[in-house]
Amino acid sequence: MRNIGIAGFGTVGQSFFTQINKNFKNFRVIQIAVKNVKKKRKINLKNIKVTSKVQELATNPNIQVLVECIGGSSGAAYKLVKTAIENKKHIITANKALLAIHGNELVKLAEKNNVSISYEAAIAGGIPIVKTVRENLKYNNISKIYGILNGTCNYILTKMEKEGKDFSLVLKDAQKLGFAELDPTFDIKGIDAAHKITLLSSLAFNVPIKFSSTYIEGVDKVELDDFRFAREFGYKIKLLGIAERKKDSYEQRVHPCLVKEDSEIAKVENELNAVVVIDDMIGKTVLIGPGAGGKPTGAAIVADLIDLNRGNINLPLGNSISNSKKLKNINILDSSFAYYLKIVVKDEVGVMRRISDILARNKISIDQQKQEHSNKRGYATIVIITHKIKEKIFSKAIKEINNMKRINNKVKFIRTEG
């Protein structure tokens, strides 16, 4: 019998509790921490101690497993988890922000106290990516792991493409349907996906967790006509989290990408998530499933609990943090991409030639291009797909183009991937 404490009793905490109560008799929830003890709940909590003092769970000697569903990278969640580990309690959490920011410290503490930190629910909800990488693929020399890691952004991009609605309208729809938070900043700015790819990068490459090294761009600058232009060139637009190893260095980044329309990742729509792992033994492994929501996330917590009950006290990162590799992090300026550019210019003779001269001078070659009249009278929209070029060179060229007098607003660009 495992005695469990649940910190936080929102959608995820309630879903986990319901699944445990219904299907597993060898687990017993003995204490739950909530914000409001007096709040009426549909779930029967008879014979369970309910408290508003969350730190009680960390020191309750009868609790062996703490399920943390509070959220947040610091404050109550951090103090609770740290104290619980010091009291030799196993941790199961859906809190990717906490681990991305404080993971190295907490993992080291967990190893010292011989307890586990399980976090399947923190990354891509219903996709068992942590277990897959840690137990099945880690020793296959993973060279790259990437995917759609935020269901809110994937839903927004899908609806913009399919229904022709602009970003702000789709975001409002997503909020009404519960696919986006009232404050969607962490989702639409790419921060949530960055937390997740940081953890996957550490797990896949055996490097310390380093969120500060993750390059981050969100989806809030993607415009409606970008989808049409991308489609004409054979692409779709997705927000991807990407971690890639190159010899003694690695990179981790989150940004919108143009992906080939016939690729697996391009076909993943709405709130679904997908993760692709590339290694030297199997090649490509693709996992697709629901990335968020009470039931998938609750099920992931249950899966971690079952694993723990079987005696699988896994090292959180697959290897001891003291044996992690010291790989150099690659700055995005030193990475190379093919780029999609959208430039709105005055519709005058010689403007395109000037842009071509700037690209040529910086040794940026054009793969595809088109030009059409802009919605703004007297202006034209030029769209270009380049061949691969290092970002620092590309950035220099874009700065030159932006300084042209006949440019309307700044150049918009999206990197291609794959």
What are these regions (language model features)?
Residues 7, 305-418:
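A conserved regulatory-domain signal marking ACT and ACT-like small-molecule sensing domains
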